[in-house]
UniProtKB/Swiss-Prot annotation:
Principal subcellular localization: membrane
Keywords annotated in UniProt: Cell inner membrane, Cell membrane, Chaperone, Membrane, Protein transport, Transmembrane, Transmembrane helix, Transport
Lineage, top ranks: Bacteria, Pseudomonadati, Pseudomonadota, Gammaproteobacteria, Oceanospirillales
Source organism of this protein record: Marinomonas sp. (strain MWYL1)
GO BP annotation list: protein insertion into membrane; protein transport
Compositional bias per record (Polar residues), positions renumbered to this chain: 56-68
Protein's name in the database: Membrane protein insertase YidC
Stretch list, region Disordered: 34-68
HAMAP family for this protein: YidC_type1 (MF_01810)
Signal peptide feature range: none
Gene name linked to the record: yidC
Amino acid sequence: MDFRRYFLWGALFISGYLLFLQWSQDYGPQSTQSVAQSTQSQSETNSQMSDDLPMATQSTTEANAEIPQSVTKIAPGKLIEVTTDTLRVAINPVGGDLVEAALLQYKKELGQPDPFVILEDGSERTYVTQSGLVGQDGPDASPEGRPVYQSEKTAYTLADGENSLDVNLYYTDAKGVKYTKTFRFMKGKYRIRQLITVDNTSSNTWRGNLFAQIKRDNTPDPSKATSMGLQPYLGGAISDEQTKYTKVSFSDMKEDPIKTTTTKGWVAVLQHYFVSAWIPEQGQKVTLQARTNGDFNIIGFTGTSVEIAPGKQGTLSSTFYVGPKLQDHLESTAENLDLTVDYGWLWWLAKPLFWLLTLIQSFVINWGIAIILIVVCVKAIFFKLSAASYRSMAKMRKFGPEIAKLKEKYGDDRQKMSQEMMALYKKEKINPLGGCLPILVQMPVFLSLYWVLMESVELRHAPFFLWIHDLSVMDPYFILPILMGISMFVQQSLNPTPPDPMQARIMKIMPVAFSIFFLWFPAGLVLYWVTNNTLSILQQYVITKRIENEA
């Protein structure tokens, strides 16, 4: 009896503790430099400093000189603005870099009209993407600084009825080589196709390397939505031929820079719910890099040297994704990019759980109701197993007086008392560990749903009813955690009373402890637990009354 109870609550406590540890690991404070230091450095270093650009080594080109610092800076008013149904981006003509990106279908804050801004190049935060051509003849490696592109106009809009929009930037170097940098935007998409065409009108063979990278300072994640001062994971990630998905923190970039060669993969910067990623052409050899330069974290790729004969043209292409962690969008953009929706080691359970949750939501149009219905589905799947466990617990409750008599009769002779209790269990066909199964079975589902709620952008700002306006954050009035504690008390009343007074007191404290523990958990997760407890109480109550009536 004692062993069963200790095992049951021990499993619950350990699972909760492991959950908190995982929360701290995934959403704990990142070891970044102070924001003040980063902001100060921005007055000295802006997003257009070309010493941030990669240096093409002897293995990829004949040139290996360090790229000089750009001296050209374009005023913010001269940026090229592009608007689609999903994105509003700004392109700096210097280098043709994307320096701003707003997600038009996602609000910065609940109830506010302003869209969420993921990329920006301002006085308080630098998070931009850079791309171009380096190497022997690459214009981004010119001693005079990065190329200043021209465009036909300064504002582009994806018109109604159009499925794509091409934004072309033009530049001609001193040798007469013509460059066309094209950004192709697509309706309903967050991926941007980049094409750099080199028209070698000179008399010499052109040689250069394609590069693309993401550059970010150490400022906090503006999309964080956790409590207790905890922050979501903010850092890089790499995918290559050896590993499908590897996190690379900003501190790792500084202490142990990464440089690896591959023919498939991508590089990305992750934050809560959103991601930016560069995907080179698959099948072509590239070097993936993650490093720091001053106060900036840089992750990107550099291609091998390309040669274009005089009078010929060549096009170097890649894809940039900037937007929410929508799994269908990520899967269609690049292999393994959907792994940036990090469900942890229970991904194999979390993925189908999310699929089922999404399917239910498509019918009920409410994520809170979908969570309740998914609990019903889980309870239905494990109904027989739970029923057997509850019958075992009901029998334990029924024979509680006899167990108390055995304890009184044999006193301190624990060996004899254990023998008599086991004989009683065998006679009455009672499984002393049977009551553990309901909690143990639902623990993986509980942990998986935790990751689903924390990682799925679909639940960001998703309302339920009444006071719950966002299921991805804590209950603002702590009503659900209190209801969860009450449900645990009720569930305890249906269980057999522990024979040990100290154990009984500990059991009474557990609902209070778990209520406090769950105060800061996402409301959707607590809603799942309250619903699960309520259905368990109903099932256990019916079974307990049935067994008592049989007596």
